[in-house]
Amino acid sequence: MSTGIRHARWDDIPRERVTDDISRRLFTGERMMIAHVYLDKGAIVPTHQHENEQLTYILEGSLRFWIGDPAQGVEELVVNAGEVLYIPSNVPHKAEALEDTFDLDVFSPPRQDWLNGTDSYFHDKK
C-alpha cells in the first residue's frame, strides 16, 4: 500500500545552481513545497509574483524585501535570522541578500516554474 509519504535528508537532495550567487534544494509534496535557498551577499531576487502563498524563514543572514506594486506603493523591510515573512498570493516582491543568507521557503501550491525551469525572472536583475 502506497501512502504517498516520502522522506529525505537535505544533504542528499541535489543543490541546484540558479544564478552565480543563488542556489537551492527542493522537496515537494502534492500541494506544498519546501526549499533551502542559499544567497551570497548582494544576490538579488528580481521583482516577481506568483499564485503561490510563500513563507520565508531566515535561518542565517538577512534579506531586504520590497513588497507591493510600485504603482500603489512599495513596503521595504529587512528580515533577519530567526524571523519569518508571509507573502500572500500574487503580491509583487523583490529581495536582496544583505549578507550571506540561508533561508527556508515554503510554497503552496508548489512552484511549478521552479520545478520545470521556467523561472526566468531570476535572470532579470530589475
Give each language-model segment a name.
Residues 44-46, 64, 84-94:
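Histidine-centered metal-chelating micro-motifs
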